[in-house]
Design a protein with these regions (language model features):
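Intrinsically disordered, low-complexity segments enriched in glycine/proline and serine/threonine
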Residues: 6-8, 176
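N-terminal secretory signal peptides that target proteins for export/translocation
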Residues: 1-5
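Bacterial N-terminal signal peptides
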Residues: 9-21
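N-terminal secretory/targeting leader peptides
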Residues: 25-123, 135-327
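An acidic, glycine-rich surface segment that forms the CoA-thioester-binding/catalytic face
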Residues: 129
């Protein structure tokens, strides 16, 4: 997934940082300027990076040039685990990551990726509101400040081969990100063997058929051209791709209170605007894939089996990854 992950964060943040362009302002004195080194898997020149730059202009405007973002895009800093490690080591200051990356910092956040738990946007909004303070404290306790949440469309199963019920995955090669215990457990519950590789290896894996099935949004599949290697798409979704942006706590609190407020406010406004774009574009991508000839799979006749696998996955992860109180 250099490509998927790139797409993933392209999407997940699609809007994670959209903000109207601001007027340019004079640079602050170099001795007073704070540069936030921000790691992203989004490719240079992508729509996401254009949005990131718009966020940066607004941040610079709001802080009168005292704070700005410096982007390290295209996975130049590695995968999400590398981002988090480098932020902790002081080599980076912030990163945009998926729930998998967020879970490396605060493991209970992975509950948001549990299959079948959050499948509609209104559910996501309620859950995000209800758990935001709790998760924010978890991030702080682990040395990070949560800047915002983002999303990247509805998670669906895509495959090169036909499928309809959970049992069909036993003869397929489903990908599970090596740092994601949630989907890997889901695959194990079904009785299949997940292909556990890092994000940068996924696209090549599809080319060589090392793997043939992936959980991804229609938006990501179109943006990264995955659809050219995938033939089947589930009509029903397993969840919603969720992620966010985090910054090292020491870096954040080194800013003045005014600049902290500007950073949080601009990122939050951007994220919410981006959510609207992600939802719209994911729906358009879904329709586009159907028009391009991908075979739509109706999994509803086997809903009971899918729901049972999802419920067993959540049960298995409760107490090991997240607490029952989060469900």
């Amino acid at each position: 997934m250099t490509k998927f992950k790139n797409a993933f964060v392209v999407l997940l943040a699609l809007g994670a940082f959209l903000l109207p362009g601001a007027v340019s302002v004079p640079d602050a004195d170099a001795s007073q300027k704070s540069i936030i080194r921000f790691a992203s898997l989004a490719p240079p020149g992508s729509a996401f990076m254009k949005l990131m730059k718009a966020w940066n202009r607004s941040l610079k405007d709001g802080t009168e040039g005292r704070v700005e973002l410096r982007f390290y895009s295209g996975g130049s800093q590695g995968d999400e685990r590398d981002f988090i490690r480098k932020v902790r080591a002081g080599q980076m200051d912030a990163a945009g990551v998926s729930t998998t990356g967020l879970g490396i910092v605060a493991r209970p956040v992975l509950v948001l990726a549990s299959p079948g738990l959050i499948t509609e946007y209104d559910q996501l909004e309620r859950t995000r509101t209800a758990l935001n303070d709790r998760f924010a404290k978890l991030f702080e306790d682990n040395g990070f400040v949560l800047l915002n949440w983002g999303e990247a469309g509805k998670t669906r199963l895509f495959s090169m081969e036909p499928f309809a019920k959970p049992e069909d995955l036993k003869k397929l090669r489903p990908w599970a990100w090596k740092d994601d215990p949630v989907f890997a457990e889901f695959v194990h519950v079904i009785g299949a063997n997940p292909v556990r590789v890092g994000a940068p290896e996924v696209y090549g894996g599809l080319q060589t058929r090392m793997l043939d099935t992936v959980p991804v949004s229609a938006l990501a599949a179109v943006a990264m051209q995955w659809y050219t290697r995938l033939n089947y798409m589930a009509e029903q979704n397993l969840g919603i791709i969720i992620g966010g942006s985090v910054i090292k706590k020491e870096k954040f609190y080194a800013l003045s209170e005014h600049d902290q407020k500007v950073l949080l406010e601009t990122s939050e406004r951007a994220a919410r605007a981006g959510d609207k774009l992600a939802r719209r574009d994911d729906a358009r991508a879904y329709d586009s894939l159907i028009k391009r000839g991908i075979t739509l799979v109706d999994t509803s006749p086997h809903k009971a089996a899918w729901d049972a696998a999802a419920a067993q996955t959540r049960k298995n992860l409760t107490g090991r990854v997240y607490s029952k109180s989060l469900l």
